[in-house]
Amino acid sequence: MEKERETLQAWKERVGQELDRVMAFWLEHSHDREHGGFFTCLGRDGRVYDDLKYVWLQGRQVWMYCRLYRKLERFHRPELLDAAKAGGEFLLRHARVAPPEKKCAFVLTRDGRPVKVQRSIFSECFYTMAMNELWRVTAEARYQSEAVDMMDQIVHWVREDPSGLGRPQLPGAVASESMAVPMMLLCLVEQLGEEDEELAGRYAQLGHWCARRILQHVQRDGQAVLENVSEDGEELSGCLGRHQNPGHALEAGWFLLRHSSRSGDAKLRAHVIDTFLLLPFRSGWDADHGGLFYFQDADGLCPTQLEWAMKLWWPHSEAMIAFLMGYSESGDPALLRLFYQVAEYTFRQFRDPEYGEWFGYLNREGKVALTIKGGPFKGCFHVPRCLAMCEEMLSALLSRLA
C-alpha cells in the first residue's frame, strides 16, 4: 500500500509540473492581444506560422482556461480569466457566419472574417462549451443564454432536421452515424448539467439517448468498436464500416464511465471497461514500437489513411484519462498498470523538454514527424485537459489512501 501511494504521489507531482509547463507555453505564445482570441498555428518554439483562427480550437481554449481557473487554485489568475473573456468576446463577435443564424464558421481570418464552413456540428459544440464555462467563472447570464440557445440548435440538427448544416442528400451516400456525434452531445450534456439541477433534468433523457447510440458502435458480438454504423446500429460494408480509431474508442469510454457514475449504473461501467477500454487497447497498442495506432481496419486489412500507423498526441491523452478513471471507478489494478504503461510512453515520446508543450505527430517508431506544437487540429485542449483531469483523479486516489 505504501509503495502504491508513493507511485501515485510521484505521478501526481509529475503530471502537475507538466501541466504548468504546457500552460506556460500557451500563455506566452498564443494570445492575440490586438483582436482577441488565440493563435494555434505555433511552431516548436511557439512562433506563429499562420494567423488563421479555427473556431473549434478557439472554443476549446476558452473552455480550458475557464476550467483551470475554476478547478485548480494555482490557475485562479487574472491573466487566464482576461484571455478567456477576450476569446469569448471574439467568438461572440465573429464565430457565427450569418447572425442571427447559429451556424458557425470553421476557419476565420485573424480579425474574424469567415474563411471556411464545415457541414458538421463541432464548431458549434465547442462554442457552447466555451460559453457555459465563461458563465460559470463570470456569472454573466448572456454567456449562459448563448450556450443554451446553441445547445438547442445542435440538438435540433442532430435529432430532428440536419438540413441547416448544409449537407446535400446525395442518392448514393450511405446513411451512417459517426460515433463522434453522440459522443460530442454526451459531452455537452455533462458540461451543461454540472451542478445545475434544472439543465441536468432537462437533458437527462438526451444523455441516455447518447449513451445508447455510442453503445451501438460495439459490433461483432462485442469484439470490435467501429467508428461508423448504420442509423439502425448495424455494421456497414466496405472501408467505412471497418474503420476503427482506438483513441476515439478510449475517449468514448471515459465519457461513458462518467455517465455511468452519474447514473449509478455499475453494470454499464463493467461493460464499458471491457469494450471501450480493454478491447481497443488490446487491438490498438503497437506491440513492436509501443503507442496506439491512429487507425485500424477491423478485418486486419491495410487502412487507406496515410497516417494510420502514426502515433498522435490526443489518443494517448485520452487513454491516460480513461485508464485512470477506470481504476478510480473500479479499483481494478490492471487498469492502473495500463495507465502507467501509457503515461510512461506518452511522457517519454511526446513531451518537448526544450521548448515545452507536446509534439503532436510521431511516426510509427515514435520519432517526431512534425515539429509543430499547434495547427488546424491541435490546440490548447487534449494535453492540458488530460493533465488537469489526471491530477484531480490522482489527488482523489491519494485522499482515499490517506
Swiss-Prot record:
Optimum temperature is 47 degrees Celsius. Kidney, liver, adrenal, and pituitary glands the amount being much greater in kidney than in the other tissues. One of its GO terms (biological process) is N-acetylneuraminate catabolic process. One of its GO terms (molecular function) is peptidase inhibitor activity. Residues 185-206 are annotated as: Leucine-zipper. Gene3D superfamilies: 1.50.10.10. Pfam families: GlcNAc_2-epim. It comes from the Eukaryota. Keywords: Isomerase. Its EC number is 5.1.3.8. SUPFAM superfamilies: Six-hairpin glycosidases (SSF48208). Activity of the enzyme is enhanced about 20-fold in the presence of ATP. The record marks C380 as: Important for enzyme activity. It is an enzyme of class 5 (isomerase). Changing L192D: Fails to bind renin or to form a dimer. Optimum pH is 6.8. It catalyses: an N-acyl-D-glucosamine = an N-acyl-D-mannosamine. Homodimer. Forms a heterodimer with renin and inhibits its activity. Belongs to the N-acylglucosamine 2-epimerase family. Catalyzes the interconversion of N-acetylglucosamine to N-acetylmannosamine. Involved in the N-glycolylneuraminic acid (Neu5Gc) degradation pathway. This is N-acylglucosamine 2-epimerase. The lineage of its organism: Eukaryota, Metazoa, Chordata, Craniata, Vertebrata. The gene is RENBP.
